[in-house]
């Protein structure tokens, strides 16, 4: 039977800091891959920070978060770290 190796990433994010939070996701993903993890699980709202409250009402922030998620997915793929599933 094939086994699947998971890594759980409990990281401290900052509300609204999309670039910094994405960098942490990349860093933890690299560390997990180095430890032979096949799946890395992050807490909800890792990219946007929690709670986003009023930021969620701003169309520009929602678009920026979407764009950053796509950029992060591309970077993960380029680094052969897999895909980003939300």
What do the PLM-derived regions correspond to, one by one?
Residues 1-86:
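Hydrophobic structural segments
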């Amino acid at each position: 039977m094939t086994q699947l190796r998971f890594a759980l990433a409990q990281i401290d994010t900052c509300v609204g800091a999309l670039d910094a939070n994405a960098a942490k996701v990349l860093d933890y993903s690299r560390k997990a891959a180095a430890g032979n993890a096949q799946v890395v699980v992050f807490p909800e709202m890792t990219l946007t920070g929690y709670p986003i409250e009023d930021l969620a009402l701003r169309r520009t922030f929602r678009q920026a978060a979407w764009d950053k998620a796509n950029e992060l997915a591309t970077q993960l793929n380029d680094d052969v770290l897999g895909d980003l599933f939300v």
